[in-house]
């Protein structure tokens, strides 16, 4: 699978990182684990997993968990790719609406998002622009 300018070895490393992050999920309520990995412009991989809470509104998705790691390391832009996986063998897991809006804040429209099933045997690639067409973003506030 070719994804943007990402090398095959980088994409495989991203997939492995997302699958491993999924194992670190804290999801005692939904029992649906999600993992995410992000490749930065200097080829560093950051990961995150969903973390649930008894007060459901306090849960955080894997995508935002990973993005916070990236942002706290000082990488505000220029990310290369995101990979998401979750506990569905039949379907590739896509970002929820909140995560789509959050991701949109920091990436360009052609930013590739690779969605995997639980084993990584199925994949679908979409861009941020495809996942959130006509997105509301920072330019609307100028």
From Swiss-Prot:
Q: Which residues bind substrate?
A: 50-52
The positions making up the signal sequence are none
> What Gene3D superfamilies does the annotation carry?
Cytidine Deaminase, domain 2
EC number(s) in its UniProt entry?
A: 3.5.4.5
Source organism, top-level taxon: Eukaryota
Q: Which reaction does it catalyse?
A: cytidine + H2O + H(+) = uridine + NH4(+); 2'-deoxycytidine + H2O + H(+) = 2'-deoxyuridine + NH4(+)
Q: How is this protein organized at the quaternary level?
A: Homodimer.
**Extra info from the record?**
Present with 3120 molecules/cell in log phase SD medium.
Name the record gives this protein: Cytidine deaminase
- The scientific name of the source species is Saccharomyces cerevisiae (strain ATCC 204508 / S288c)
Give the encoding gene's name. Answer: CDD1
């Amino acid at each position: 699978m070719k994804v943007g300018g990402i090398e095959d070895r980088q994409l495989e490393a991203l997939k492995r990182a997302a699958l491993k992050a999924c194992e670190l999920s804290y999801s005692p309520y939904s029992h649906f684990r999600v993992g995410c990995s992000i490749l930065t412009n200097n080829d560093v991989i950051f990961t995150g997993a969903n973390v649930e809470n008894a007060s459901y509104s306090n849960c955080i998705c894997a995508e935002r968990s990973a993005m916070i790691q990236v942002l706290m390391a000082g990488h505000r832009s220029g990310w290369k790719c995101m990979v998401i996986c979750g506990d569905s063998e039949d379907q590739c897991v896509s970002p929820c609406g909140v995560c789509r809006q959050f991701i949109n804040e920091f990436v360009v429209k052609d930013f590739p998002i690779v969605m995997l099933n639980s084993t990584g045997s199925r994949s679908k690639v979409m861009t941020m622009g495809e996942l959130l067409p006509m997105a509301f973003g920072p330019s609307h506030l100028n």
